[in-house]
Design a protein with these regions (language model features):
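Extracytoplasmic/periplasmic ligand-binding sensor regions of membrane-associated signaling proteins
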Residues: 52-132
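A short, polar/proline- and glycine-enriched secondary-structure boundary/capping micro-motif
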Residues: 80-84, 142, 171
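Short glycine-enriched, charge-decorated loop/helix-capping segments at active-site entrances
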Residues: 28-33, 75-78
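Signal-transducing coiled-coil linker helices
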Residues: 31-42
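Solvent-exposed, extracytoplasmic
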Residues: 40-51, 55, 122-170
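Short hydrophobic alpha-helical segments used for membrane anchoring or interfacial signaling
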Residues: 16, 59-66, 152-161
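Juxtamembrane extracytoplasmic/periplasmic/luminal helical "stalk" adjacent to the first N-terminal
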Residues: 1-28
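Amphipathic coiled-coil signal-relay and dimerization helices
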Residues: 22-24, 62, 67-74, 160-167
Length: 171
């Protein structure tokens, strides 16, 4: 629980930061700002600082203005298809700014976390953040839980399907 809360806090930090807000509101598609102190470069540095973890495989921010910001910890990360991304963005939109966890372990091997970013002043949607956590990280979290007696940890998705752990541990 602490791990996921930490991830949620980082996502919220990026979503509400002044740099993200300005870039998602005023950035222009097809325009790359080269200056070290440009909003785009500052946003990318912020993404690297907050998510350089072996738990996180990639982080992507989709702006309503058409710009796309991507950061990956690994070289060979399988990015979701456009249809999957559209579905995730719709789920984030339906949550109206809330954080949504999507079980995508069977397809991509990741737990996808999405959040709709809203303008701090107008509360209108300006983009979506997508973060993927690899299944190895979930297994490591599950194994690190220690009980004083017999016990096991299962990680379930929103439909109570087992994400990590064995069904035999339920008995």
């Amino acid at each position: 629980e602490n791990f996921m809360q930490g991830i949620y806090d980082k996502i919220n930090y990026i979503a509400y930061s002044a740099t993200t807000q300005e870039e998602l509101c005023y950035g222009e598609k097809g325009v790359y700002e080269e200056g070290y102190f440009s909003r785009e470069r500052e946003l990318k540095r912020q993404m690297v600082r907050l998510f350089n973890s072996f738990y996180v495989d990639d982080l992507q921010i989709y702006a309503k203005n058409g710009k796309d910001y991507y950061f990956s910890v690994k070289q060979e990360v399988k990015k979701p298809e456009k249809e999957e991304i559209a579905k995730m963005i719709q789920q984030a939109t339906d949550a109206m700014g809330g954080i949504v966890c999507i079980n995508d372990l069977k397809h991509s091997g990741h737990l996808q976390i999405v959040k709709e970013v809203r303008d701090n002043l107008k509360m209108s949607p300006i983009g979506t953040i997508r973060l993927s956590i690899n299944s190895d990280a979930l297994e490591q979290i599950r194994k690190n839980v220690n009980f004083a007696s017999e016990g096991a940890v299962l990680i379930l998705d929103e439909k109570n399907q087992i994400v990590q752990g064995q069904a035999s541990e339920l008995s």
